[in-house]
């Protein structure tokens, strides 16, 4: 049976081993997301059939990511291992953040299921070359904002950020918080998580970059290359420096997006302002994240039916049937006719209400 280990900072190398080549294009399939949002996702992992299997605990419910194969990984075998684990532990089988292109094989695998694909959690995918150039009339708005920024701050320059720049980054957070006006719990939580992720920059696997004006950062991004998709985990700019956001987006894409097809700027979480902003950059695709809740024939029943035959009537068990049902389970003389022996499946101590 699968054995899960909670994901901690020390597992970043193991996660990158799988996510570095993962072509799912979704932000959840990255080391940065698992670590940045670990307090919310409560992720744990197992390795099986050459695949990474991640289990998350969200709102009191276990949900599994779609398996991520290594070079010789067998996704079908990994899915079978998840099925067996859920059967053995009596855990409802829920596969979440499934890439849309993987849906057909799961629909064939599980004919009875409940599926949804919420708009709020779809990731915004952009072509890396579009973000690096902002060419053509359709990007005239972004170019105008960048030109105004360059005119207002002629000495501004883009710089890669490494672990050696942590003092610079800490000063940026202090400046950013002075201008931060959002009061919602989600906004404050996201900022705290972003600051925590930035502290991992010295580990060497995150890609960092920012805009420098007079030796102070006015904007910064943190990202991760996963299978040719540049996943932007953090993207912040000082509100007082108008045009800093599009300037950062373009410069970051030009510097880090050369070997990438897509740039993933993650979801908008239903925030209207964020949605408007992300749409203005003209995504080529809103990448869906499907949720599969696997069911069986019994799940379709609204109530347990009563079945009547000439010899007997089958009805739902009631409290008054407890003693008779318990006696039946322990009746070796009868159970031997259909090969049932409770001792083979007994787990723990045999109590009076064990079978109920």
Question: In which residue ranges do the predicted regions lie?
Answer:
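Conserved donor-binding loop and adjoining core beta-sheet/short helix segment
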Residues: 17, 28-101, 212-241
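Active-site rim helix/loop that mediates acceptor-substrate recognition in acyltransferases
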Residues: 27-44, 186-204, 344-356
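Short, conserved active-site entrance elements at the starts or edges of catalytic domains
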Residues: 164, 168-216
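Conserved catalytic-core motifs of GNAT/GCN5-like acyltransferases
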Residues: 116-124, 284-300
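Aromatic (often tryptophan-rich) hydrophobic motifs at membrane interfaces
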Residues: 205-293
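Acyltransferase donor/substrate-recognition loop-hinge adjacent to the catalytic core
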Residues: 111-182
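Conserved active-site alpha-helix within GNAT-family acetyltransferase domains
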Residues: 102-117, 144, 269-286
């Amino acid at each position: 049976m699968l054995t899960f280990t909670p994901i901690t900072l020390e597992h970043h190398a193991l996660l990158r081993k799988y996510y570095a080549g993962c072509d799912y294009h979704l932000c959840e399939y990255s080391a940065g997301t698992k670590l940045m949002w670990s307090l919310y996702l409560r992720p744990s992992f197992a390795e099986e059939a050459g695949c990474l299997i991640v289990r998350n605990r969200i709102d009191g419910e276990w949900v599994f990511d779609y398996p991520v194969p290594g070079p010789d990984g067998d996704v079908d075998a990994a899915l079978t291992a998840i099925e067996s684990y859920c059967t053995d532990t009596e855990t409802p089988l829920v596969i979440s953040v499934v890439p849309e292109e993987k849906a057909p094989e799961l629909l064939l695998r599980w004919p009875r299921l409940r599926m949804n694909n919420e708009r709020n959690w779809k990731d915004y995918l952009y072509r890396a070359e579009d973000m690096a150039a902002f060419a053509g009339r359709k990007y005239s708005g972004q170019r105008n904002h960048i030109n105004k920024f360059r005119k207002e701050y002629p000495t501004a320059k883009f710089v890669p950020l490494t672990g050696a720049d942590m003092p610079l980054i800490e000063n940026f957070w202090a400046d950013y918080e002075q201008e931060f006006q959002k009061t919602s719990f989600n906004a404050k939580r996201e900022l705290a998580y972003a600051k925590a992720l930035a502290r991992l920059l010295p580990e060497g696997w995150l890609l960092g970059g920012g805009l420098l004006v007079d030796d102070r950062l006015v904007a910064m991004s943190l990202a991760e290359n996963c299978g040719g998709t540049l996943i932007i985990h953090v993207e912040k700019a000082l509100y007082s420096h108008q045009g800093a956001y599009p300037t950062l987006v373009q410069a970051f894409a030009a510097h880090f997006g050369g070997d990438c097809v897509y740039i993933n700027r993650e979801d908008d979480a239903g925030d209207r302002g964020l949605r408007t902003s992300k749409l203005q950059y003209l995504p080529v695709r809103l990448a869906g994240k499907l949720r599969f809740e696997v069911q069986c024939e019994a799940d379709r029943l609204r109530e347990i039916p009563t079945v009547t035959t000439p010899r007997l009537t089958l009805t739902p068990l009631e409290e008054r049937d407890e003693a008779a049902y318990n006696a039946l389970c322990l009746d070796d003389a009868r159970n031997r006719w259909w090969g049932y022996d409770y001792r083979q499946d007994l787990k723990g101590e045999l109590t009076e209400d064990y079978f109920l």
